[in-house]
Amino acid sequence: MKEDMEVLSLASLPVGFRFSPTDEELVRYYLRLKINGHDNDVRVIREIDICKWEPWDLPDFSVVKTTDSEWLFFCPLDRKYPSGSRMNRATVAGYWKATGKDRKIKSGKTKIIGVKRTLVFYTGRAPKGTRTCWIMHEYRATEKDLDGTKSGQNPFVVCKLFKKQDIVNGAAEPEESKSCEVEPAVSSPTVVDEVEMSEVSPVFPKTEETNPCDVAESSLVIPSECRSGYSVPEVTTTGLDDIDWLSFMEFDSPKLFSPLHSQVQSELGSSFNGLQSESSELFKNHNEDYIQTQYGTNDADEYMSKFLDSFLDIPYEPEQIPYEPQNLSSCNKINDESKRGIKIRARRAQAPGCAEQFVMQGDASRRLRLQVNLNSHKSETDSTQLQFIKKEVKDTTTETMTKGCGNFTRSKSRTSFIFKKIAAMGCSYRGLFRVGVVAVVCVMSVCSLVA
């Protein structure tokens, strides 16, 4: 008796039955039969060109109607170029982009029968596409008898489409922030109801050593802004009264600062005694004529000191002279004794009203007297030079008149010598007058020679 086999629909199956083949079953059974042309045996998986449809339209073409977000399709290999190996994965709204690396599919433990590649759908165009929640696994056979080039074979791949549930309502994600892991596994978050906080122990242990200046009791409180719940302890100062502050002020010990004479002598020994004797003899001879050193004597310094003392070591004895306005003109008189040196004259007493003015003027009158004194010496020197110049001019004139024009060059040289002497003279009024007289005489002598 012939038994008829009844085909059951998926809707009539009990709950828990579903079409979910493994990776090895997809390649070893379904893909092999499809490549070899046995379409009726694998009609449970529909053939469709993935790149001609958008991913959100593909679930409606699935043969198996399921509530799971997983669908299987056969897809023919659509090469981008006839002679190339790249696949055309672009659609109207976007493109499929491979991510990660290919994973091997094994039969048993060692035999490799295929590879699995993961692709993610992006809307827009590369490289500014936006990642979506649609994921696809592409299963390809790697055995030589399934390359699709033999007679009766057609190149196919199996595509498993997923829709990730963690991206709600197709929320977009930029391509730059994509992840390499695109497995459709959905992770369930772990909810923590209660978090018990343990008591925080201090990091540094308390030290039992106390400072000698510990504080015991006081009403002094240091103000501070503490934003935490910790309150600042009160600072006490009563214990400060028990401290012997005088012990800290004994800093005059020779061990802290300079050593004592006995300490230095004990450390240095005989060398310290020799140094002390030499230093005493050095200061003992400061009143003698000179001091002998390893570099010579100080004779030159002694001579210079005596020379300066002859001018500066003059006793100053001010005279108390009553203030007389008519005697102010007498301060310009020159003392005859000043010719041998500089003598500081006594300062006359000033009137009470002129005391402030005298302080402001300082020693201006003294400087004037010194200047007059110097001019007086200069005038005497100029008189001697003037007599010599007159004699030279007279001799030159006589010689020029006697010898005539032949000796004009010689007279010219003598005249230049005369002008040099004139330039060496001082610039006093009497000297200028005498120079003018000499110049007139010279001009007259030259004119007579020219005539």
Curated annotation (Swiss-Prot):
Stretches assigned to the NAC domain: 13-164
Coiled-coil stretches: none
Domain of life: Eukaryota
A GO CC annotation given for this chain: membrane
Region: Involved in Transcription activation, residue numbers: 1-268
GO BP terms in the entry: cellular response to hypoxia; defense response to virus; positive regulation of defense response to virus by host; response to molecule of bacterial origin; response to virus; viral process
Membrane topology: Single-pass membrane protein
Record field: transmembrane: 431-450
Post-translational modification: Phosphorylated at Thr-142. Phosphorylation at Thr-142 is required for nuclear import.
UniProt keyword Coiled coil, yes or no: no
GO molecular function ontology, one term from the record: DNA-binding transcription factor activity
Region: Turnip crinkle virus (TCV) capsid protein- (CP-) binding, residue numbers: 351-451
Entries under Gene3D superfamilies matching the protein: NAC domain
DNA-binding feature ranges: 113-170
UniProt entry keywords in alphabetical sequence: Activator, Antiviral defense, DNA-binding, Host-virus interaction, Membrane, Nucleus, Phosphoprotein, Plant defense, Transcription, Transcription regulation, Transmembrane, Transmembrane helix
Domain commentary: The NAC domain includes a DNA binding domain and a dimerization domain.
Subunit details: (Microbial infection) Interacts via its C-terminal region with the N-terminal region of the turnip crinkle virus (TCV) capsid protein (CP); this interaction prevents its nuclear localization and inhibits its function in basal resistance response pathway.
PANTHER family (UniProt xref): NAC TRANSCRIPTION FACTOR, PROTEIN CUP-SHAPED COTYLEDON 2-RELATED
Listed name of the protein: NAC domain-containing protein 91
Species per Swiss-Prot/TrEMBL record: Arabidopsis thaliana
